[in-house]
Amino acid sequence: MLSKRIVTALNTAVKVQNAGIATTARGMAGASGSEVSKILEERILGTETGINLEETGKVLSIGDGIARVYGLKNIQAEEMVEFDSGIKGMAMNLDVDNVGVVVFGNDKVIREGDIVKRTGAIVDVPVGDGLLGRVVDALGNPIDGKGPIANARRSRVEVKAPGIIPRLSVREPMVTGVKAVDSLVPIGRGQRELIIGDRQTGKTAIAIDTIINQKRFNDAGDDKKKLFCIYVAVGQKRSTVAQIVKRLTDAGAMDYTIVVSATASDAAPLQFLAPYSGCAMGEHFRDNGKHALIIFDDLSKQAVAYRQMSLLLRRPPGREAYPGDVFYLHSRLLERAAKMNNSLGGGSLTALPVIETQAGDVSAYIPTNVISITDGQIFLETELFYKGVRPAINVGLSVSRVGSAAQTKAMKQVAGSMKLELAQYREVAAFAQFGSDLDASTQQLLNRGVRLTELLKQGQYVPMGIEEQVGVIYAGVKGYLDKVDPSAITKFEKEFLAHLRSSQQALLKTIREEGQISPQTDAQLKDVVVNFLATFKP
């Protein structure tokens, strides 16, 4: 009799369990694999955890920096999530049955079954004056060992670029201190100028010189001329970034500079995010009526990181295996550089993106994309670099589409004819090597071209003021150096600049403040050059 009762009780228990399993199976139809078996096991054991699937989820799989998460039903696109281990991630793929999350850090500490929580916030970073002089990672966390960042508020990394009405056309010069750039491909505040070339051709050198050159304006105390700088290092070696920070510190340029670093050893999502984080920091200055310069070094590596993420998220590949929206990746970033109108404070954000080409091929996918987005490009050539022409700027292929409107009148007056003369020189030089008997005008063109090319050479980390550039270029363009041996041009420039700085400060001040060469200044400059050449010994 007792055994009969036990059997009846067991049968009842099995029926209850079966009913529970059927309910669970219907409720969890969206889950798969180990997740389903885990939930069923918990239900059978009567230890249901009661997780809220709207606000939390569980890791189904983890690998290659991508986590597939079950749950998180209410999550937004690009929302930050937090894993059990404290590592942050960003929701990129919102699929029917799971969420694809890119992990901002080491995915080795994340396990299957870990809880993932929504933060309710889109990815944001600290912005403000407190970041000046600091080195931060792609999420704005300090990595320079100088303690937490003070005096900063938080801002989203992805914001919409300013529309047409809030903008003004580019009108103020952004002086780089590099003669070849300021005279031939001038850049204005609010412009996007691409620096493009093969590896080891001096792309970063131009960018760093530009940052160092802003010291003269920032030290002058005029808020309208101050330019704050953001240097974004993407996919570079840590040793290279440390070297750049040391160089900027030695030059006293870190006082007005922020360095955002996502090095080669950082996760691909951080390399993808770093340019947007840097841009948000630059927009703080732009939107508060100040001026900022941002350097993306380089966007080729950001595109590679984005390709890696997209392929791992199973997004369909396109040309060169890049995803279909790789153009939008860069356009939405670079469109945020702008010159704002006066009612919005008149601030500006200037962008100098860097692109690395392979064997000088500017017709590849990413280079052509960025060329079409920017307002001009500075093209650096390996061949010129090895010939000793440094900066190795190909004047024929380099162009600034809007910068001439911002160029100072003094520079326009002296450098106006130089681009044409150099273009004619290159054309004639190609034919001159085939024949020796040249007419006088062709010989004159060759002589002038050789000397102007020598004159545009410049050492690294020695940017020049615009008034000094005007003085040197004036001597070359007006023909005063035609009789000076090309090998002595560098010596002439060095001694002539020393002469101007020591005994012609009033003349330099006039050029700097008036911004143009009046007939009186022209006569004065002529006298200075002629008198100096009379005593110059090559």
From Swiss-Prot:
GO CC annotation terms, alphabetical: mitochondrial inner membrane; mitochondrion; proton-transporting ATP synthase complex
Disruption-associated phenotype: RNAi-mediated knockdown of the protein leads to impaired growth and development. In addition, it impairs the assimilation of enterobactin-bound iron.
Tissues where the protein occurs: Ubiquitous (at protein level).
Residue pairs linked by disulfide bridges in the UniProt entry: none
This protein's UniProt keywords: ATP synthesis, ATP-binding, CF(1), Hydrogen ion transport, Ion transport, Membrane, Mitochondrion, Mitochondrion inner membrane, Nucleotide-binding, Phosphoprotein, Transit peptide, Transport
Annotated Gene3D superfamilies: 2.40.30.20, ATP synthase alpha/beta chain, C-terminal domain, P-loop containing nucleotide triphosphate hydrolases
InterPro entries: ATP_synth_asu-like_sf (IPR023366), ATP_synth_asu_C (IPR000793), ATP_synth_asu_C_sf (IPR038376), ATP_synth_F1_a_nt-bd_dom (IPR033732), ATP_synth_F1_asu (IPR005294), ATPase_a/bsu_AS (IPR020003), ATPase_F1/V1/A1_a/bsu_N (IPR004100), ATPase_F1/V1/A1_a/bsu_N_sf (IPR036121)
SUPFAM superfamilies the UniProt entry points to: C-terminal domain of alpha and beta subunits of F1 ATP synthase, N-terminal domain of alpha and beta subunits of F1 ATP synthase, P-loop containing nucleoside triphosphate hydrolases
PROSITE patterns: ATPASE_ALPHA_BETA (PS00152)
Single annotated GO MF: proton-transporting ATP synthase activity, rotational mechanism
Keyword Ribosomal protein: no
Ranges for region Essential and sufficient for enterobactin binding: 228-248
A biological-process GO annotation: iron import into cell
Site keyed Required for activity: positions: S398
Membrane-topology descriptor: Peripheral membrane protein
Binding site residues for ATP: G197, D198, R199, Q200, T201, G202, K203, T204
Keyword Ion transport: yes
Subunit structure: Subunit of the F-type ATPase which has 2 components, CF(1) - the catalytic core - and CF(0) - the membrane proton channel.
Recorded family membership: Belongs to the ATPase alpha/beta chains family.
Extra remark beyond the main annotation: The siderophore enterobactin (Ent) produced by enteric bacteria binds Fe(3+) and helps them scavenge iron ions from the environment. Enterobactin produced by non-pathogenic E.coli strains facilitates iron assimilation in C.elegans. Other siderophores, such as ferrichrome and pyoverdine that is produced by pathogenic bacteria, do not facilitate intestinal iron absorption in C.elegans.
Role played: Mitochondrial membrane ATP synthase (F(1)F(0) ATP synthase or Complex V) produces ATP from ADP in the presence of a proton gradient across the membrane which is generated by electron transport complexes of the respiratory chain. F-type ATPases consist of two structural domains, F(1) - containing the extramembraneous catalytic core, and F(0) - containing the membrane proton channel, linked together by a central stalk and a peripheral stalk. During catalysis, ATP synthesis in the catalytic domain of F(1) is coupled via a rotary mechanism of the central stalk subunits to proton translocation.
Protein name in UniProt: ATP synthase subunit alpha, mitochondrial
Species of origin: Caenorhabditis elegans
Organism phylogeny: Eukaryota, Metazoa, Ecdysozoa, Nematoda, Chromadorea
